[in-house]
Amino acid sequence: MARDEVRRMLPADIKREVLIKDENAETNPKWGFPPYERPIELHIQYGVINLDKPPGPTSHEVVAWIKRILNLEKAGHGGTLDPKVSGVLPVALEKATRVVQALLPAGKEYVALMHLHGDVPENKIIDVMKEFEGEIIQRPPLRSAVKRRLRTRKVYYIEILEIDGRDVLFKVGVEAGTYIRSLIHHIGLALGVGAHMAELRRTRSGPFKEDETLVTLHDLVDYYHFWKEDGIEKYLRRAIQPMEKAVEHLPKIWIKDSAVAAVAHGANLTVPGIVKLNVGIKRGDLVAIMTLKDELVALGKAMMTSQEMMQRSKGIAVDVEKVFMPRDWYPKLW
């Protein structure tokens, strides 16, 4: 992989090797539901939509519309977009609502149009913008809903797409909670002419991208109608991703069938239940606990490193924080 490609990665792009702890473990096909094989009702209940938010409404309004369109009681979005901003807005449905927490460490990508308030040579624009890659200090904008404390955020990459006079179109990958409006303001100050954000679109939120999974509100209306009125579920099934999509980027631990029900009932994960795990897990990391069918069981905080989980035969490996697996999908085997 070229250096430039490595540099243009979000945390969600990290490829993780797998360590096998128990080579003989198998899963019973009678139990559970592989993510892409759930009945459509369960697919919705445990689903996430990669929504293309239109400019205009608030993120909260868009979620309320989705609840009405799909006749849902609960839904939640992963990372607020300002009303004028369009693009990728992951919306988790019903039983999957709390999975949006998993998107926080994943990073986000935007395409922004910056308008400079004076003329600047292209080479200076390129050089100055490159300096904003890495750690930056920001204070949330006045219009922000959070307290205006100074905080550090990471800019993973900035890629200039086009410069047309005083207009600069660029792509930027950032840590969650980074304000692009503030970033542009500070780039303008560094260039000595000032600048403002003319337009903004989010193109990625962790594993959710501008790809074939991206759907509009109009799409959802049509697809729900096809299912309810005509019994055609394939379009709605394509528009709603399994909740497991939202944890693609997290370090994972796969567990035995015999351990699933215990974790689903809220028990912490102990070492004897582990079949395999990702390399590089550190104490305190947010991890996803998975079945051998790649179903999400729970999210939790690692209490051991990958190495410790491999070497030890007992002890608590993960402090379970959020359970997603229903208690009755796997039998009690303890």
From Swiss-Prot:
State any GO BP term from the record: mRNA pseudouridine synthesis
Domain of life of the organism encoding this protein: Archaea
Residues covered by the PUA domain: 250-325
Gene3D superfamilies from the entry? Pseudouridine synthase, PUA domain
Q: What class of enzyme is it?
A: isomerase
**SUPFAM superfamilies, per the entry:** Pseudouridine synthase (SSF55120), PUA domain-like (SSF88697)
Q: Which PANTHER family match?
A: CENTROMERE/MICROTUBULE BINDING PROTEIN CBF5, H_ACA RIBONUCLEOPROTEIN COMPLEX SUBUNIT DKC1
Checking HAMAP family in the record gives: TruB_arch (MF_01081)
- State the name under which the record lists this protein: Probable tRNA pseudouridine synthase B
Q: Tell me what organism the protein belongs to.
A: Pyrococcus horikoshii (strain ATCC 700860 / DSM 12428 / JCM 9974 / NBRC 100139 / OT-3)
- Give the encoding gene's name: truB
